[in-house]
Regions:
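Conserved beta-strand positions that form and line the central face of beta-propeller blades
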Residues: 8, 44, 91
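N-terminal beta-strand motif that seeds the catalytic metal site of vicinal oxygen chelate
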Residues: 1-18, 58-60, 106
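Residue-level preference for beta-strand/loop junctions
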Residues: 5, 54-56, 84
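Conserved catalytic-core motifs of GNAT/GCN5-like acyltransferases
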Residues: 10, 30-34, 85
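Conserved short beta-strand elements that form part of the metal-binding/catalytic scaffold
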Residues: 27-58, 64, 99-105
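Vicinal oxygen chelate
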Residues: 16, 60-99, 104-107
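Amphipathic alpha-helical segments
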Residues: 14-30, 74
């Protein structure tokens, strides 16, 4: 079986332009016609109401390179990382309420 990778996320947003700008400024991403592009990933924000939360644990995850880097992000968001057996992480929500996890694998 061939390898796969995530290519894009399609996120409903009441204010797609504003949400794209939030992701761009928060995570230092570039914006191209309301499409936020990061390394190998496209996030499309489409006009529309959120579809609701089918499961409370629905979120997107951003991997950071180290615990020090994670602590820097946590400080930016006034978060407190949780240390687990497999990874250290913390969660925030974007302005539309979508869950975001920032994490790094445990050493």
């Amino acid at each position: 079986m061939s390898e796969i990778r995530l290519d894009h996320l399609n996120i409903p947003a009441r204010d797609p332009v504003g949400l794209a700008q939030w992701y761009a400024s928060t995570f230092s991403l570039s914006v191209d016609r309301h499409v936020v592009r990061g390394p190998g990933l496209i996030i499309v924000f489409k006009q529309g109401d959120p579809i609701g939360r089918a499961v409370d644990d629905v979120h997107m995850g951003f991997r950071v390179p180290s615990v020090d880097a994670l602590n820097g992000w946590a400080k930016k968001f006034d978060g407190k990382p949780i240390v687990g057996p497999e990874f250290t992480s913390f969660r925030i929500a974007d302005p539309e309420g979508n869950g975001i996890e920032l994490y790094t694998p445990s050493a």
